[in-house]
């Protein structure tokens, strides 16, 4: 075949890994779909319910009322089976919707309505069991099984309070089988802690020898995988701030369920929970939402506030750096910078190849943001590339891309081998904060190193930046190029209005109702405004981006300097 085999054309070392995973998957699927496997999962039937795990995430009663009225609204899409309709026997609007539906993340919204919601939750759970109680690759796959086990375990007592004896037996038996299947899944380190936690929550909820054995096995697994999932400084190994919040919620739920059973939580659990609580504190910005990097969303304020309620040291000052991120703060400005490489290998399924990206808040409101991509957003994989972040790019090149085709189907949409290195150095003084960052993601293709310097003046209350492209290649460019174009992007929050000044070098950024705003000035050759999109709570919102364009001579390099300052304290450009 021209161009080599399919395996030869796959990117990097991921080819061999993808082939191995695909070869192992088919026999495994045949086993889990067999009668013998169903009997294996059914061993050690639970005798009843023990703990009542409490999911500490806030519920949305209005969403529960929509379900009672006959409509599931998930991820911005709607399925309307009607009152007491069956959502399981009809096609979902999209695969993404089906994932959210089968995860049962909507169950807390129903239970927030009391007995009426619990009755509907019981009916929907039994309908699911009749349709999907036997294994299939989608509804019993790890993408949905992990969250469904957690959600059903937390809902079990409320549902069973209205169940007949036969329905009660069905619910606890299904929960036990699903949790046992969850412990069988071995897809590498990514989400291993989340799977073990969900299985342990189910084990804590189930009474009798079957529940106790399930709990013991899940806790053994959790003790083993937690150190790899939570970094020593408290971040999630994926470098996704939202992942840290979600795992903190799950571990807090498990800690509470173990306490109900009179059991002491393992030291590994308590230590990880303490470190994750510190990460939640670090990533919570002035608007009460999260910094949105590496596949994490900013989330709703109430959601983040609920996570912070679990932090016994919430009043402690947060460190200036954590998990590869830096925070810089003055009176009115708050800056977060991504100063590390994306997570490697299996941890990168939600990672973004966007080195040195920043987010900026002005007076507690988002001003400069990233694209806001997340695995649950209705966004293209292109939103994980460098152009979708507030950083610099050269030509039309990417610093890394998600796997595609066969490799993506086998391994998930992890980033292809990321070879670039990121360096950072920070200095602090009474009058200002300096952060110097650099990465060599453009070195192989262009012979250039991107260096970004940030200075936040504490007294002046302004942010100064310099993006420099420094040559690292002593020989001529192999392609014979002398110049290549570069772009420095600033994606704006969808609530920000932008206007280019008459000098064509400055852009006025204003929030609605703000009389002054902020000037973004630069010495770029060309300054333009172009359309952009920002994903918030998983939904696209049209916005704009400021582009600073120029040309870099490969033998000499180039730089562009810019400054963000309050329009209330600065003269307007002429």
State where each predicted segment sits.
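Residues that flank catalytic or metal-binding motifs in active/ligand-binding sites
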Residues: 102, 324, 356, 388, ...
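Catalytic core of carbohydrate-active enzymes
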Residues: 336-420
């Amino acid at each position: 075949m021209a161009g080599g085999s399919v395996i030869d054309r796959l990117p990097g070392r991921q080819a061999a890994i993808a082939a191995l995973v695909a070869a192992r998957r088919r026999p495994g699927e045949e086993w889990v779909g067999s009668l013998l496997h169903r009997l294996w999962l059914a061993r050690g039937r639970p005798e009843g319910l023990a703990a009542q795990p409490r999911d500490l995430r806030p519920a949305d009663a209005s969403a529960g009322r929509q379900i009672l009225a006959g409509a599931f609204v998930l991820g911005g899409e709607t399925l309307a089976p009607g009152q007491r309709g069956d959502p399981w026997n009809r096609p979902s609007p999209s695969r993404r919707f089906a994932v959210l539906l089968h995860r049962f993340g909507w169950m807390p919204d129903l239970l927030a309505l009391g007995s009426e919601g619990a009755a509907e939750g019981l009916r929907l759970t039994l309908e699911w069991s009749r349709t999907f109680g036997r294994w299939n690759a989608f509804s019993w796959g790890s993408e949905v099984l992990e969250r469904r086990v957690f959600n059903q375990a937390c809902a079990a007592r409320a549902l069973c309070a209205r169940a007949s004896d036969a329905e009660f037996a069905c619910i606890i038996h299904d929960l036990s089988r699903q949790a046992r299947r969850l412990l069988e899944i071995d897809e590498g380190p990514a989400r291993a802690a989340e799977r073990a936690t969900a299985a342990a929550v189910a084990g804590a909820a189930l009474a009798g020898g079957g529940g106790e054995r399930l709990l013991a096995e899940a806790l053994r697994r959790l003790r083993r995988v937690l150190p790899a999932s939570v970094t020593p400084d408290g971040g999630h190994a994926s470098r996704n701030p939202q992942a840290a919040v979600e795992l903190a919620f799950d571990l807090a739920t498990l800690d509470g369920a173990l306490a109900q059973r009179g059991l002491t939580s393992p030291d590994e659990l308590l230590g990880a929970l303490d470190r994750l609580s510190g990460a939640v504190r670090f990533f919570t910005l002035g608007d009460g939402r999260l910094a949105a990097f590496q596949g994490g969303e900013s989330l709703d304020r109430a959601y983040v506030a609920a996570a912070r309620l679990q932090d016994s040291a919430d009043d402690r000052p947060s460190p200036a750096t954590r998990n590869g991120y830096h925070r810089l703060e003055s009176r009115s400005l708050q800056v977060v910078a991504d100063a590390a490489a994306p997570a490697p290998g299996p941890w990168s399924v939600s990672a973004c190849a966007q080195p040195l990206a920043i987010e900026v808040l002005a007076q507690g409101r988002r001003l400069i943001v990233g694209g806001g991509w997340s695995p649950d957003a209705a966004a293209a994989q292109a939103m994980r590339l460098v152009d979708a972040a507030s950083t610099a790019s050269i030509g039309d090149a990417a610093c890394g891309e998600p796997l595609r085709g066969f490799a993506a189907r086998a391994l998930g949409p992890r980033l292809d081998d990321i070879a670039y290195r990121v360096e950072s150095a920070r200095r602090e003084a009474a009058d200002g904060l300096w952060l110097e960052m650099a990465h060599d993601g453009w070195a192989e293709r262009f012979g250039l190193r991107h260096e970004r310097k940030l200075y936040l003046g504490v007294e002046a209350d302004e942010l100064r930046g310099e993006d420099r492209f420094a040559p690292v290649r002593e020989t001529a460019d192999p392609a014979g190029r002398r110049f290549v174009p570069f772009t420095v992007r600033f994606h704006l929050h969808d609530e920000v209005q932008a206007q280019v000044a008459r000098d064509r070098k400055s852009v006025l950024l204003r929030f609605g109702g703000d009389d002054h705003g902020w000037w973004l000035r630069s010495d770029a050759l060309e300054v333009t405004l172009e359309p952009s999109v920002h994903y918030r709570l998983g939904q696209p919102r049209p916005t704009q981006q400021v582009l600073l364009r120029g040309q870099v001579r490969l033998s000499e390099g180039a730089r562009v300097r810019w400054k963000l300052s309050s329009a209330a304290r600065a003269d307007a450009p002429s």
